[in-house]
UniProtKB/Swiss-Prot annotation:
Keywords: Cytoplasm, Hydrolase, Manganese, Metal-binding. Belongs to the PPase class C family. The gene is ppaC. This is Probable manganese-dependent inorganic pyrophosphatase. Gene3D superfamilies: DHHA2 domain (3.10.310.20), inorganic pyrophosphatase (n-terminal core) (3.90.1640.10). It comes from Staphylococcus haemolyticus (strain JCSC1435). Transmembrane segments: none annotated. The keyword rRNA processing does not apply. The keyword Cytoplasm applies.
Length: 309
């Protein structure tokens, strides 16, 4: 049996890493003994906390050419967010909770996308539907992914299904959701030991928005000013990256995980459109966005609409 490569998006967050591991376990339970999780970037501190807590080994960094290889995508579908050779791969299955864009295949496939807050929530449902046993460490990874994507159930992307899945799994994983969740989020919120380039690359995705290519990075923190005090270095790095990668717009979203607000820093010729998107006036390229925490639901659609109208 040929190997099946399973991976989430570039600059992986906790859901991307956890869902790759979970999906590989699910596939193995179906009889696919060669299902193997991979990652498309470094493990961030939040994810490392979760992996260490549940004693799970991090997936190997993907380096293989995927030409003709069988792959399963989790937590993404857009090719610009995926592996470099994804267009040459044989995509067999996708499990995701994002918009569908810049995605096509030569052959039919299994595609499961649901409007929930986390890919791991969909995977939880898949285990239940098949009557598969959920191992304690798999339960822990599911919980970690849900807490990460929902910011401990505060994000507007969070649904009752996400909350109920986490509650159903907590005893199996042997964790208190609030206590463990806050510890995990704080583990990923330290920014003082990272360069501007590292901050911008921690959780960043590229999006095709009409005729524009937009890069949106998000940094979770307990102190927004701690991040934006480095505005000059961040802007310089954003401009350099935009020039090298030909981004029309680069938006940094700095999110306060305690108070559930964000500030944005924007560079690019179309940056005034970002102000229009949120009905705010950018001040030196920055603006405060009250109650905004979700890139998927509160940032991407708004900027897309502003750019294409």
């Amino acid at each position: 049996m040929a190997k099946t490569y399973i991976f989430g998006h570039q600059n992986p967050d906790t859901d991307a890493i956890a869902s790759a591991i979970i999906m590989a376990d699910f596939e193995q339970l179906t009889g696919n003994s060669e299902a193997t999780p991979y990652r498309l970037g470094d493990i961030n501190p939040e994810t490392k906390f979760a992996l260490d807590h549940f004693e799970v080994k991090a997936p190997e960094l993907l380096s293989d050419n995927l030409d003709g290889r069988e792959v399963i995508l989790v937590d993404h579908n857009e090719f610009q967010q995926s592996a470099e050779t994804i267009s040459d791969a044989e995509i067999k299955h996708v499990v995701d909770h994002h918009r569908i864009a810049n995605f096509e295949t030569a052959s039919p496939l299994w595609y499961r996308a649901e409007p929930v807050g986390c890919t791991a929530t969909i995977l939880y449902k898949m285990y239940k539907e098949r009557g598969f046993e959920i191992k304690p460490h798999i339960a822990g990874l599911m919980i970690s992914a849900i807490i990460s994507d929902s910011l401990l159930f505060k994000s507007p992307t969070c649904t009752d299904e996400d909350v109920n899945a986490a509650k159903d799994l907590k005893d199996l994983a042997n964790v208190d959701l609030d206590e463990y969740g806050l510890e995990m989020l704080k583990a990923g919120a330290s920014t003082t030991d990272k360069s501007a380039e590292e901050l911008l690359d921690m959780d960043a995705k590229s999006f095709n928005m009409g005729d524009y290519v937009t890069r949106i990075a998000q940094v979770n923190t307990v102190d927004i000013d701690e991040v934006l005090n480095r505005k000059e270095d961040l802007e310089k790095a954003m401009l350099e990256t935009s020039a090298n990668e030909k981004y029309d717009l680069f938006v940094l979203v700095v999110t306060d995980i305690i108070n559930s607000d964000s500030k944005i820093l924007v560079v690019g010729a179309e940056k005034d459109k970002v102000g229009e998107a949120f009905k705010v006036q950018l001040d030196d390229g920055m603006a405060f966005l009250s109650g905004v925490v979700s890139r998927k639901k509160q940032v991407v659609p708004q900027i897309t609409d502003a750019l294409i109208k």
